Amino acid sequence: MIGRIVQILGSIVDVEFKKNNIPYIYNALFIKEFNLYLEVQQQIGNNIVRTIALGSTYGLKRYLLVIDTKKPILTPVGNCTLGRILNVLGNPIDNNGEIISNKKKPIHCSPPKFSDQVFSNNILETGIKVIDLLCPFLRGGKIGLFGGAGVGKTINMMELIRNIAIEHKGCSVFIGVGERTREGNDFYYEMKESNVLDKVSLIYGQMNEPSGNRLRVALTGLSIAEEFREMGKDVLLFIDNIYRFTLAGTEISALLGRMPSAVGYQPTLAEEMGKLQERISSTKNGSITSVQAIYVPADDLTDPSPSTTFTHLDSTIVLSRQIAELGIYPAIDPLESYSKQLDPYIVGIEHYEIANSVKFYLQKYKELKDTIAILGMDELSENDQIIVKRARKLQRFFSQPFFVGEIFTGIKGEYVNIKDTIQCFKNILNGEFDNINEKNFYMIGKI
């Protein structure tokens, strides 16, 4: 079926078809002359459909011929995507040749049926001490990652990818939504150097691409992750940045003629976010655990975009510049980060009590810092001096050498299981290492 372009509004293109030949919603249309795909969004009457362009509309003109493919946008899925960079259409953009795929999947899929989903309180061991102790990941859960530039978001993501691949025999999918091209490029080459590239699929919709690409690229990556899950794997899904997904939706919504809601966001914000997040779930075959980088506009947590995202999260990890300045990596703030899974019924009484004791010591140390700076340690009570010394040891013990950081630090990476993590922190709290210098706790795995 062939139609003709009748109107172009930025990324929005209106196409007229003959009566009884109107394409379905989400059908892919193709403009051969420009090698450009469109996706049908609305049927607006008079045999006209309104579409999103998944590419630049520069040079398009009215009355160009448009072909209805009679199919939705399909992306290659499976092991053929590992180690490759794909765009929103599932085409490789890494100059490493074509992807030979036996199977393609639509980017718009329904979430698993309730009867197919598996709800468990199983904790996903990451091998990173501070995460496993204070903000454990739920297998199949959703984790929000807050952090500015240069505090270690990328290196943390790379270590998680490595640990899931090597220790759990799983795989990862990284979706760059509105990514800076430089960041995506750096991420690719750093993972190549760290030998984890063959365990991850990369799907990029870069910052310079039209809003249609940035809005749909998350769905392309999600379809690839879902296929790995159905293959029986534990999948770690990274989305960077979930805010830019919302922003792309805002741009498209205005062009589609929808009335904006609070702060200018699209009226369908909650629905769009829900459709994306509901697909991230565990089934009888495997699990998808997602780590989502979240930008908070003007540090306003009540902004509709982050507040809509928060409702879906199980854990929150905050990367702190103050901790990074102390040279403690990963620079995760133990007092700001939290997890709903830190519950005695899920992690056990011992884990819960030790985690709370660690937080108490660190909070007390934080409160005493001003006193120490003015009067010195000697003016503190004997009990407070013990708390401060142990808290400093705990703080340094949160540092950990990463496998993916070996090429930078020269220190061999360490994977620490949850059992060892709990025991080591318990020993520090009990005073078994009170006579050992705090420097000895820096950049080690288990004691």
UniProtKB/Swiss-Prot annotation:
Localization in the cell: Cell membrane
Stretches of the chain forming a coiled coil according to its record: none
E.C. no: 7.1.2.2
Ranges annotated as spanning the membrane: none
GO molecular function: ATP binding; ATP hydrolysis activity; proton-transporting ATP synthase activity, rotational mechanism
Residues holding ATP: 147-154
Catalysed reaction, written as an equation: ATP + H2O + 4 H(+)(in) = ADP + phosphate + 5 H(+)(out)
Classification via Pfam families: ATP-synt_ab, ATP-synt_ab_N, ATP-synt_VA_C
UniProt-listed PROSITE patterns: ATPASE_ALPHA_BETA (PS00152)
Any one annotated GO CC term: plasma membrane
Top EC class, one word: translocase
SUPFAM superfamilies on file: C-terminal domain of alpha and beta subunits of F1 ATP synthase, N-terminal domain of alpha and beta subunits of F1 ATP synthase, P-loop containing nucleoside triphosphate hydrolases
Subunit structure and binding partners: F-type ATPases have 2 components, CF(1) - the catalytic core - and CF(0) - the membrane proton channel. CF(1) has five subunits: alpha(3), beta(3), gamma(1), delta(1), epsilon(1). CF(0) has three main subunits: a(1), b(2) and c(9-12). The alpha and beta chains form an alternating ring which encloses part of the gamma chain. CF(1) is attached to CF(0) by a central stalk formed by the gamma and epsilon chains, while a peripheral stalk is formed by the delta and b chains.
Stated role: Produces ATP from ADP in the presence of a proton gradient across the membrane. The catalytic sites are hosted primarily by the beta subunits.
Family stated for the protein in its record: Belongs to the ATPase alpha/beta chains family.
HAMAP family, sorted: ATP_synth_beta_bact (MF_01347)
Protein name per the record: ATP synthase subunit beta
GN (gene name): atpD
